[in-house]
Design a protein with these regions (language model features):
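Charged helix-capping and loop-helix junction motifs
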Residues: 53-58, 134-142, 170, 174-176
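Short acidic/histidine-rich active-site segments
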Residues: 124-125, 149-170
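Acidic (Asp/Glu)-rich catalytic clusters
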Residues: 24-34, 61-64, 88-91, 111-118, ...
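Active-site beta-loop-alpha junctions enriched in small/polar residues
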Residues: 1, 44, 75-77, 102-105, ...
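Distinct, well-ordered alpha-helical segments
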Residues: 50-53, 78-91, 108-116
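Structural preference for beta-strand elements that scaffold enzyme active sites
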Residues: 36-38, 67-71, 96-98, 118-122, ...
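Active-site glycine- and acidic-residue-rich loops that bind
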Residues: 99-105, 124-142
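Active-site gating/metal-coordination segments in enzymes
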Residues: 1-64, 120, 125-130
Length: 180
């Protein structure tokens, strides 16, 4: 998502981004020996900017060189089909793509279309009752399973803020999914 990108991402070429990612994959991130197991990219709300296209193409190229799967950020559940198709056009097989935040998309038909195209989708706002509530998520997942897509639906709690961690007085807590 462009608004959260570091300034460097706007300046680097696609080739520079590819080389930077390969360096981290082969030698570790931030001076450590910890190597990534997934490549992340994303898009803005209802839009894919030129910089985001450059990053998605770089992520796709790195995937084709390494086999590391690609996980995406679909801002408020938008642009999932476009992200997936851009990755496929640049060499990523649909089964190696995990489209994130798809449960925020209110139109179940868009989620089903992503699944029909072979993409994996991430229901990761579980416990975060923003625009959708968990009962709606469960209902949609039941439909996806009945349609034969159960193996392509992933559950997660996108709980990256203190507001969601019980140790800081937040809710629902990191163990929420395990308890429901």
């Amino acid at each position: 998502k462009e608004e959260f990108l570091p300034e460097l991402d706007f300046k680097l070429t696609e080739t520079d981004l590819i080389n930077m990612l390969l360096e981290e994959i082969n030698n570790g991130m931030d001076g450590t020996d910890i190597c990534p197991g997934v490549i992340k990219c994303g898009t803005s709300y209802n839009n894919i900017t030129e910089t985001e296209v450059k990053i998605i193409k770089a992520a796709a190229k790195v995937h084709t060189l390494t086999g590391i799967p690609v996980s995406t950020h679909c801002d408020k559940g938008t642009m999932m089909l476009e992200q997936g198709e851009l990755l496929v056009k640049n060499g990523v097989k649909p089964e190696n793509i995990l489209l994130g935040h798809t449960d925020v998309q209110k139109d179940l038909n868009i989620q089903l279309e992503a699944l029909k195209r072979g993409f994996n989708i991430l229901t990761d706002h579980v416990g975060r009752e923003l625009d959708n509530i968990d009962e709606d998520r469960i209902r949609k997942i039941e439909i996806m399973i009945r349609e034969g897509f159960g193996g392509q639906v992933f559950l997660s709690g996108d709980m990256g803020k203190k507001d969601y961690v019980t140790a800081y007085g937040g809710r629902p807590g990191l163990d929420y999914i395990l308890g429901v």
